[in-house]
């Protein structure tokens, strides 16, 4: 199924997962709002970044990224600098505090090896206080990628025949399939899930389909979909990466 002619020449939003199928796509050529996930900042600067793990969020802040952020579903709560001494116990990973930082967030997540848990104190750079929002409890426990798709439709479209592209959403293998596999704050390729990674991916697919069904006036284009079981939804289409820039 391919995208309809009536969708030509309209605004586009690109939601980038971190599956290997997007590794050969030149992100700088994407004409529209680019929403990235987690460690994408290591390779390019998206317009918006979405993250749900504390370790990745601390890395994003320490990288100097100063764009719009959606961090956690409901746990990003600013605390005044006066609360630091009563809370800190010296075991946390604490980000660099600039001289003008007035607020921080105290949050727990996984350590860099994605095995142990770790608490983080994230100092918020001056000017970023209003650029970082919670994703929202309506998609609590969703994956980062599917949460980013939800954000794209809720906050970055007019719900009027705009195109929403999905890139790097690779949900077909039964192993951890990610560009950043075996790096800090990411699982190893041989990591396991109780019911297998495919079961996890199937759940993520259901989240994607829910978003698509909730926005019938938007056209969704899944780039580099792999498999012969393409979902039959009236507003979901497929394209190869070579066709992204074709009318």
Model-derived features with residue positions:
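Metal-ion/cofactor- or nucleotide/acyl-coenzyme-handling active-site neighborhoods
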Residues: 1-247
């Amino acid at each position: 199924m391919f995208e309809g002619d009536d969708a030509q020449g309209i605004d586009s939003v690109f939601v980038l997962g971190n599956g290997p199928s997007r590794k050969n796509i030149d992100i700088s050529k994407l004409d529209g709002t680019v929403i990235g996930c987690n460690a994408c900042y290591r390779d390019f600067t998206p317009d918006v970044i979405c993250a749900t793990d504390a370790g990745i969020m601390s890395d994003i802040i320490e990288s100097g990224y100063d764009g719009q952020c959606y961090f956690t579903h409901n746990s990003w709560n600013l605390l005044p600098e006066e609360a630091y001494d009563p809370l800190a116990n010296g075991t946390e990973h604490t980000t660099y505090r600039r001289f003008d930082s007035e607020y921080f967030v105290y949050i727990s997540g996984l350590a860099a090896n994605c095995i142990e848990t770790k608490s983080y104190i994230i100092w918020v750079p001056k000017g970023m206080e209003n650029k970082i929002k919670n994703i929202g409890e309506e998609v609590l426990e969703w994956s980062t990628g599917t949460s980013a798709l939800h954000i794209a439709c809720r906050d970055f479209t007019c719900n009027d025949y705009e195109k929403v592209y999905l890139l790097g959403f690779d949900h077909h293998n039964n192993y951890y399939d990610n560009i950043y596999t075996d790096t800090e704050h990411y699982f190893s390729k041989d990591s396991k899930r109780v019911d297998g990674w495919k079961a996890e991916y199937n759940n993520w697919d259901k989240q994607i389909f829910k978003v698509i069904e909730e926005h019938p006036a938007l056209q969704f284009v899944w780039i580099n979909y792999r498999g012969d079981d393409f979902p039959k939804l009236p507003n979901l289409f497929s394209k190869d990466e070579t066709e992204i820039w074709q009318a």
